[in-house]
């Protein structure tokens, strides 16, 4: 038999059941309903529902069939007109559980309708979120269970004993079946400290344009929350919250595929289930916000990496430590690492919880789909998400509201994360101020030096111009005495420049004396007489003449140096006696 696609809706007097059976034989179908039971059969489809309210057969029931769409629509009158049926969109919970064909089990769950008034604690009572404390007692090693438990409600164990190699990429903990909860937490904290990168954090902190864009994004629950606050200013009724959240056909198909079952959880395990739900929702809200609702290949990694419940099998004792752990992991692992993003995700999770279990279920279905399409993250569906999708449909709305209030009262600061964020930010601001101060000083200095440098440039240009003018005048004076002497001087100038070396000597008074060594064969090494060269420097000049490769070069403008050499050579040529 096939379970058909179905949908339930209601008005004050009727419950409407729409059943899609495209391949059914329309001429043969049966409908049965009485009290909270509803059954439909049209070969090869069979549907059995346990309704949240009672219906009655009084002659006002109606039925129709749309041949084009293949949909049966059945309207059933309510036993109590005006009564609101809760949880009509929780399709898995509506599917009646399978009855055992064996003997009656030794442990049996008692339904709420069968509970005596004084025997069992009322599930609607206010939930106490404070963990019960007991005196510390030393536990002997022989009493410890080596098979540490994990999964939904800590009901699973032994899963990783044979699949450690295949599933090592899913979780961060090694040998979870032999690692206690305390050891898991110790290793997790050490891994987070080793992974924290101050440079990455400061880069996102100082240059937060991308983070601002992520913070401005409005996910699907933001509009629903605004609508809820507008329409439910006075009271928050379950029927109004359920009407805000709708499920797609794909999500309804997911719900029909889940196996309806019950969970026997003690008080401690029950609390762990709620706490882990917060942790998983925080990771999901972060992923939805940073990707702006567009899933990618990193979505599964982000969710399981940011949730210690999923990657470290962490257990919790209060809401605050969940926030601290989530904040640390956001600043250590994903692409965007900013504390404002942590707080924004925290507020998103509160909104989802306040929207009710329909919104929570929608988030869990999305996580289930992401993990199902990722290898090997699908194992986390078997350990956690599938059970959460079934369990949340039967969870009490009052407890979710109480959980939202407990989360809303919690607070988180940077100092509580234990990563020295405030010290890093203070150091970054100090460096930024120093850089700004140094840049301002360099800018003011350059502005002061600009006029002086321009004046120096103009002064050097004037000196070069005067030097060239003096050289021209000296050349004109030397050309006046006679053509023979000038020709002799110029004939010696060519080889003299090519094969001579100039040594500039400074005397005590700072005067620059020049001695020129003639490069001809007859007079090699003999200094030409210079009018201003003192006689005491004769031996020194002779020694310098023998070592031509040693010279002191003083950089000066080419024009002035050339003019100086020409003037010296011409003066010496005039002093040389004619043959």
Curated annotation (Swiss-Prot):
Question: In its keyword annotation, does this UniProt entry include Cytoplasm?
Answer: yes
What subcellular compartments does it reside in?
Cytoplasm, Cytosol; Nucleus, Nucleoplasm
Q: Name one GO cellular component term.
A: cytosol
Low complexity: bias regions:
444-458
* Start-end of Acidic residues biased regions: 459-482
Does DNA repair appear among the keywords? no
Sequence segments annotated as region (Disordered)? 438-492, 550-579
User: Basic and acidic residues bias located where?
Assistant: 568-579
* Domain CS, first and last residues per copy: 1-89
Keywords, alphabetical: Cytoplasm, Nucleus
Q: Which domain of life is it from?
A: Eukaryota
A GO BP term here is: protein-RNA complex assembly
Q: Listed GO molecular functions? A: unfolded protein binding
Subunit-level organization: Directly interacts with DKC1 alone, but not in the context of the core trimer composed of DKC1, NOP10 and NHP2, nor in the presence of NAF1. Does not interact with NAF1.
Return the PANTHER family for the record.
Answer: PROTEIN SHQ1 HOMOLOG
What role does this protein play?
A: Required for the quantitative accumulation of H/ACA ribonucleoproteins (RNPs), including telomerase, probably through the stabilization of DKC1, from the time of its synthesis until its association with NOP10, NHP2, and NAF1 at the nascent H/ACA RNA.
Q: Which family does it belong to?
A: Belongs to the SHQ1 family.
Name the UniProt record assigns to this protein: Protein SHQ1 homolog
Task: Supply the source organism for this entry.
Answer: Bos taurus
């Amino acid at each position: 038999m096939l379970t058909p696609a179905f949908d339930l809706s209601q008005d004050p007097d009727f419950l409407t059941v729409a059943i899609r059976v495209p391949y059914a034989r329309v001429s043969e179908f049966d409908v049965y309903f009485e009290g909270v039971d509803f059954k439909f059969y049209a070969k090869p489809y069979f549907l059995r529902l346990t309704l949240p309210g009672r219906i009655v057969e009084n002659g006002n029931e109606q039925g129709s069939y749309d041949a084009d769409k293949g949909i049966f629509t059945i309207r059933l009158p309510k036993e109590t007109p005006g009564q609101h049926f809760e949880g009509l969109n929780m399709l898995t919970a509506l599917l009646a559980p399978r009855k055992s064909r064996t003997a009656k089990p030794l442990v049996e769950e008692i339904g709420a309708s069968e509970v005596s008034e004084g025997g069992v604690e009322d599930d609607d009572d206010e939930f106490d979120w404070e963990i019960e404390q007991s005196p510390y007692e030393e536990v002997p090693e022989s009493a410890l269970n080596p098979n540490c438990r994990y999964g939904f409600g800590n009901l699973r164990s032994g899963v990783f004993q044979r699949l450690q190699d295949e599933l090592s990429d899913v979780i961060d903990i090694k040998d979870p079946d032999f690692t206690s909860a305390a050891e898991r937490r110790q290793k997790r904290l050490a891994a987070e400290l080793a992974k924290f990168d101050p440079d990455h954090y400061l880069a996102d902190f100082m240059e937060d344009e991308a983070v601002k864009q992520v913070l401005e994004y409005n996910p699907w629950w933001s509009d629903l929350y605004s609508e809820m606050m507008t329409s439910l200013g006075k009271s928050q009724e379950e029927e109004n919250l359920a009407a805000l959240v709708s499920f797609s056909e794909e999500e309804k198909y997911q719900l029909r595929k889940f196996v309806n079952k019950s969970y026997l959880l003690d008080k401690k395990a029950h609390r762990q289930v709620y706490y882990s739900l917060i942790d998983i929702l925080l990771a999901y809200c972060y992923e939805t916000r940073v990707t702006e609702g567009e899933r990618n290949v990193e979505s599964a990694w982000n969710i399981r990496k940011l949730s210690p419940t999923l990657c470290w099998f962490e257990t919790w004792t209060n809401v605050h430590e969940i926030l601290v752990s989530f904040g640390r992991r956001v600043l250590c692992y994903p692409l965007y690492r900013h504390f404002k993003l942590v707080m924004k995700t925290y507020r998103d999770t509160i909104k989802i919880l306040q929207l009710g279990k329909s919104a929570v279920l929608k988030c869990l279905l999305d996580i289930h789909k992401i993990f199902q399409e990722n290898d090997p993250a699908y194992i986390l569906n078997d350990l956690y998400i599938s059970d959460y999708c079934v369990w949340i449909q039967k969870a009490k709305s009052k407890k979710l509201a109480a959980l939202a209030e407990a989360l809303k009262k919690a607070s988180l600061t940077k100092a509580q994360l234990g990563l020295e964020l405030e010290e890093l930010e203070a150091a970054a601001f100090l460096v930024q101020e120093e850089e700004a101060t140094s840049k301002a000083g360099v800018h003011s200095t350059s502005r002061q030096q600009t006029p002086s440098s321009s004046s120096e440039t103009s002064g050097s240009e004037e000196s070069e111009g005067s030097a060239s003018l003096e050289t021209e005048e000296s050349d004109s004076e030397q050309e006046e005495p006679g053509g023979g002497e000038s020709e002799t001087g110029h004939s010696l100038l060519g080889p003299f420049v090519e094969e001579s070396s100039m040594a500039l000597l400074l005397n005590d008074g700072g005067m620059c004396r020049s001695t020129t060594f003639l490069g001809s064969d007859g007079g090699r090494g003999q200094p030409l007489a210079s009018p201003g060269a003192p006689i005491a420097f004769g031996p020194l000049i002779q020694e310098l003449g023998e070592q031509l490769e040693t010279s002191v070069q003083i950089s000066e403008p080419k024009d002035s140096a050339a003019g100086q050499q020409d003037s010296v050579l011409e003066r010496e040529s005039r002093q040389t006696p004619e043959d």
